[in-house]
Amino acid sequence: MFVSDLRKEFFDVIVTERVLLLVAPDVDALCACKILQALFQCDHVQYTLVPVSGWQELETLFLEHKEQFRYFVLINCGANIDLLETLQPQEEAIFYICDTHRPIDVVNIYNDSQVKLLIRQDDDLEIPAYDDIFNDDEEDGEDSGNESDGAEPSGKRRRFDEAAVERRIERRRQRREWEARRREIIFDYEQYEYHGTSSAMMMFELAWIMSKDSNDMLWWAIVGLTDQWVQDRITQMKYVTDVGTLQRHVSRHNHRNEDEENSLSIDCMRIAFEYDLRLSLYQHWSLYESICNSCYTSATLKLWSLQGQKKLQEFLADMGMPLKQVKQKFNSMDISLKENLREMLEESANKFGMKDVRVQTFSVQFGFKNKFLASDIVFAVLSLLENTERDEKGTDNFIKALDSLSRSNLDKLHTGLEMGKKLLCAIQQTVASCICTNLILSQGPFLYCYLMEGTPDVKMFSNPISLCLLCKYLLKSFVCSTKNKRCKLLPLVLAAPLDAEKGTVIMVGIPPEAESSDKKNFFGRAFEKAAESTSSRTLHNHFDMSIIELRTEDRSKFLDALISLLS
């Protein structure tokens, strides 16, 4: 059931209760979690926070905690499966779900008592009507008219029996037709996976309704939305619309005419709307390295080729940027160059086919020195979340990533930024390697690439977010590099080694690369059907259905089934 009043139907209900907060490991979920934690602290709500890596862990953790809690809040998990069927909770358990995953399971939508959806209904949900998918009429086993006291003449009784049989046959035919139509409706509804409004934005909306929103909460909402943009999960139109919504809040919280004392305080926090460059981490790197390791510039200039490197030199010369300036840290660049950088870069980018080199975004300044773009925070947090440098537990990474979102933990954020640079370098090197060695193969209805065991940085890509980023960057770069028009329109399936000892791979599928794409992904259902038809040993454990784990020896039969399914 959808919650129409976030305050009355959600917050006011749990404010005096103990709550179990189950949070998925993604940046938007962490931002939503920070906002909710801040609201809980305001009203002294008792809660326990538990990170949840996938469906299996959700079931295990629920079993562990179900006796101690009645109220459960799930962030970015739980909406797209039948939650009550999966968890088998007691009747008094109540689940509040704030999740961007679509489509929402129909049982969750139409359950009025135990499942409460903290999800915006104006998202393009296309929910099937209740009567089309649920049949409340119980089919009578026997027709009541069948019962006879034997007093009627046998001829009349026979005619009565025939009429009852015909009615029963007609009812069964209608039932079969209804069930066939229901299967069709459910298939159409569940066919594509996509994402709705950021959970961090939903939690900020709650804070705003309660008049408890702060600049910190607003910044977390901005980072949550930017995470969706960085990961290409929402359409450009949806992103621009949501940026507009947040921009109004930014104006409200960050007045230009604030008193001088506050605006120059060492503890101050100022958020500003920016029309900034699509260059990852450029303010914390050198401009040269950022251009080389940002997906947009690297793919458009084809930097994996000698011709691309030559084009890069021409591009920098056209900008009038001395190589010495471009290759040193951004902070050390000549001030006059820094001030005019956006305009200079945009003018030259247009000549080199990069017409969308600037994007609507936000920046934050903490005190005098620390300035960050929203995308900087996204890369830092996701790199901390999926850190493979030390063999730490996922929970440790989760806590560090969550801490890095607080402005009192800037040291952790800077650590995340350094790790983000390493991730971006690893992605670009892997993209260059895959394109130069022709590892991307056309399998008919889709492109396929497998990262071999022993590939540099392959361990990084055993994590879902990093693998998805690589997949998106790889497809964009391949589309820019190939001359085959048909291949430009194909989706991509990417697989990487997961656990050598267990002999498993992790696989992700993404829709075709197109600016106008609706970002709807059909691989989730396709993976399920391919696994079913071949009895492949797969694990559908990720909250994103288009990511699966698979036994290495089942890979070829699974792919064959996927090809025939999508052909």
UniProtKB/Swiss-Prot annotation:
Cellular compartments per GO CC: CMG complex; DNA replication preinitiation complex; nucleoplasm
Amino acid composition bias (Acidic residues), ranges on this chain: 133-150
Location(s) in or outside the cell: Nucleus; Chromosome
MF GO annotations: chromatin binding; DNA replication origin binding; single-stranded DNA binding
Alphabetized UniProt keyword annotations: Cell cycle, Chromosome, DNA replication, Nucleus
InterPro entries, alphabetized: CDC45
Region annotation Disordered: where it falls in the sequence: 133-160
GO biological process, one term: mitotic DNA replication preinitiation complex assembly
Protein's UniProt keywords contain Cytoplasm: no
Subunit and interaction comment: Interacts with topbp1. Component of the CMG helicase complex, composed of the mcm2-7 complex, the GINS complex and cdc45.
Function: Required for initiation of chromosomal DNA replication. Binds to chromatin in a mutually dependent manner with the GINS DNA replication complex.
Family, as annotated: Belongs to the CDC45 family.
Protein name as annotated: Cell division control protein 45 homolog
Upper lineage: Eukaryota, Metazoa, Chordata, Craniata, Vertebrata
